[in-house]
Design a protein with these regions (language model features):
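Beta-strand-rich solenoidal segments
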Residues: 224-299
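Ser/Thr/Gly-rich low-complexity blocks that favor extended beta-strand/coil architectures
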Residues: 122, 126-144, 166-182, 209-219, ...
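A short, compositionally biased
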Residues: 114-117, 160-164, 202-204, 244-254
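Structured, hydrophobic secondary-structure cores that serve as assembly/anchoring elements
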Residues: 1-100, 106, 119-120, 124, ...
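Charged, amphipathic alpha-helical segments
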Residues: 6, 13, 93-105, 130-144, ...
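Surface-exposed or flexible loop/turn and strand-edge residues in extracellular/cell-surface modules
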Residues: 40, 116-118, 130, 148, ...
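Conserved, function-critical positions that sit in or immediately flank catalytic
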Residues: 144-225
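Short, cationic low-complexity segments
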Residues: 143-144, 278-284, 629-639
Length: 639
């Protein structure tokens, strides 16, 4: 407490209510090839509908990772999903050579200032699906069908100087009179360019060309057609409220994103997004003081496109509102105000790409994940996940399935093939391997497909957590029933299960009347140990994670009897609770002078030894039936 130099009352407060907190144990993690969505970025997904909304529906080429993810989500948890793409994948663009923009961070670093030379727009994410997008924008010059579009010179005339002018008749409504400029060559009028399209015309305006000394020049005018998406908005874009206050005009635009080919919605021509009243001025604000600059609005809010370069006519777009009296208008003659995106390319991720995705899950301080699935990836990827995620974090389990060729249409050789797959993996208590693939219905492509079981095995751990606790075995008829499976590619017989289980592979078996069941709970640890069971490994993950989280609050306190007693009073009630919930048989916490010696204290360390007797799951049941003579006492038989 603070020293007081004169009489007074000092009020202070101490918080000694710390407890061991609950920790997450059901968060899944998977890296895969998806049809759409951000790449090389972790996205939390909590349902199959959410998975479709973010990563799109699967195709016949990339269904595997989607179906594995959806299989896991069916058990009621959420998953951290990472999409990866191959090096040749490209985002769709307006024009030029397509580029690869994996995610928001890469866009901001490489293309945030509009670089790219790909026209005004790029698809939000890599893939051919972006080729279905069309973007159209309109301002005062292109929105209505009452504006001036172009001139046709019917007579070039003669004797004109550079001072010649063209005068256009005013519109009937009096809204705004169009203006134009002349190009003179050899005294003749060679071109007439629209400088302002005007508005409110019901018929083509009359063009009067003056200052000729010879034959008079004449020209006819053509009105624009209506912007096809004008019905999506309530008003003609003119000048924003911010623009009026800043003293500029014609900064307002409307923009729509269209599903031109129906790849996103199933209906060609569907409007996916619309942005009303956005501004060409880089400093523009909306009514709630957020940026209303069209590039910022699109890049921050659109789910489908990035804004890259300005339109060709937008040479003054992006300037401050105070620097422009009137912003350039699009006009219907601008070729790039409505554009279909092209150049998007799908490329499946290579092994190195998938490994890079799993590496995002390796930092336990930034990412909380418990159940890492490897889908149908090769053993090199699965082993990488074990070595570089689970063995580094030591608070999650990697779930692996054998290769498809090992158990699908491999009659008679399944056991040897699956064991060969196992030989490529690190034998770790932080990993587990099942025996096969399931046959399930792919409703997105209307067909049945084989899918690896590792998503389901991770899902049975979720069931164990929800129905009981993480330290309960996920196997068996109570918690190990596989969902959404028509059949197994291979259901091992008893003799085959004996071989698999002895090697550390958990069989998944189809039992008539009982469904398809996970029939083993081993980890990949090769040596005899309590940690060669999933429930024991997950028990220690929970204990270590929860106690370590609570122990952080002892950092920078004094290593004295009070702190040690406080730590024991923190941990022991937690362990008694776990014991009451059948997770451990007994425990002891040692945190005193015996393990916090003077030398340990002088090294600024704090030590606690926590001894637990983990509960064991039943793997083998022996039932002995003994027949006796009628006159024999059971006590005589030792019963």
């Amino acid at each position: 407490m603070a020293f007081q130099l004169s009489p007074g009352v000092l009020t202070r407060e101490q918080d000694l209510t710390n407890v061991v907190p609950a920790v997450a144990t059901t968060i899944g993690g998977i890296v895969g090839d998806y049809n759409w969505g951000p790449a090389n970025q972790i996205v939390s997904i909590d349902s199959e509908n959410n998975l479709v909304a973010v990563f799109g529906k699967p195709t016949t080429a990339n269904f595997l990772d989607f179906m594995t993810t959806s299989s896991f989500l069916a058990y009621g948890s959420n998953a951290l999903v990472i999409r990866e793409v191959g090096a040749a994948a490209r985002n769709s663009v307006s024009s030029g050579t397509a580029v690869l923009i994996k995610n928001t961070e890469q866009f901001q670093e490489s293309y945030g200032a509009g670089e790219g030379s790909v026209g005004p727009w790029a698809g939000k994410y890599a893939g051919a699906k972006g080729n279905s997008l069309k973007v159209s924008m309109a301002d005062f010059g292109s929105y209505t069908n009452t504006s001036l579009k172009s001139f046709t010179i019917t007579a070039a005339g003669s004797g004109y100087s550079d001072n010649a002018i063209v005068t256009l008749s005013a519109p009937d409504s009096g809204t705004a009179t169009a203006t134009a400029s002349l190009t003179i060559a050899g005294g003749a009028v060679t071109a007439i360019t629209v400088t302002f399209p005007g508005a409110g015309y019901t018929s083509a305006p009359t063009a009067t060309i003056t200052d000729g000394t010879g034959t008079g020049a004449t020209a006819t005018t053509v009105l624009t057609t209506a912007w096809p998406y004008a019905s999506q908005f309530d008003s003609v874009p003119t000048t924003t409220t911010f623009g009026l206050g800043a003293g500029t005009t014609l900064d307002e635009m409307h923009l729509v994103v269209i599903d031109e080919d129906g790849e996103f919605t199933g209906v060609a021509g569907t409007v996916l997004e619309k942005f009303a009243g956005i501004s060409k001025a880089s400093d523009a604000k909306d009514d709630v003081n957020q940026s209303n600059y069209y590039k910022n609005v699109v890049n921050q809010r659109s789910k489908y496109i990035w804004s890259m370069d300005h339109l060709a006519i937008g040479t003054d777009w992006g300037n401050l509102s105070t620097a422009e009296a009137t912003f350039n208008c699009i006009q219907q003659v601008s070729a790039d105000h409505t554009v279909s995106l092209i150049g998007g390319v799908d490329t499946a991720p290579a092994t190195a790409d998938l490994q890079a995705g799993y590496l995002l899950l390796s930092n336990d301080e930034l990412v909380d994940v418990s159940l890492v699935m490897t889908s149908g990836h090769g053993m090199a990827v699965s082993d990488y996940a074990i070595d570089n995620v689970a063995e580094i974090r030591k608070d999650c389990i990697v779930f692996v399935s054998p290769l498809r060729a090992s158990c699908v249409n491999n009659v008679g050789a399944e056991v040897a093939s699956v064991k060969a797959d196992l030989s490529a993996l690190t034998r770790s208590s932080y990993a587990t391997m099942d025996s096969g693939w399931k046959y399930m219905y792919d409703r997105y492509n209307d067909r049945y497909v084989y899918v690896p079981l590792n998503g389901d095995i991770a899902g049975t751990c979720v069931v164990a957590d929800v129905s009981n606790d993480p330290w309960f075995s996920p196997a068996g008829y109570n918690r190990g029933v596989i969902k959404n499976a028509v059949k197994l590619a291979w259901s091992p017989k008893k003799s085959e299960r004996d071989t698999l289980y002895s090697a550390g592979i958990n069989p998944v078996v189809g039992f008539p009347g009982n469904g398809i069941v996970l029939f083993g709970d081993k980890t990949l640890l090769a040596k005899p140990s309590a940690f060669n069971r999933i429930n024991v490994r997950r028990l220690f993950i929970v204990l270590e994670k929860a106690v370590a989280t609570a122990a952080k609050f002892q950092l920078f306190e004094f290593n004295d009897a009070f702190t040690r007693a406080q730590f024991r009073s923190l941990v022991e009630p937690f362990l008694r609770d776990v014991q009451g919930r059948r997770g451990i048989y007994d425990f002891r916490v040692v945190c005193d002078e015996t393990n916090n010696t003077a030398e340990i204290v002088d090294q600024n360390e704090f030590r606690a030894d926590i001894f637990v007797k983990p509960a064991k799951s039943i793997n083998f049941i022996t039932l002995t039936f003994v027949a006796t003579r009628t006159g024999i006492s059971f006590e005589e038989l030792g019963a």
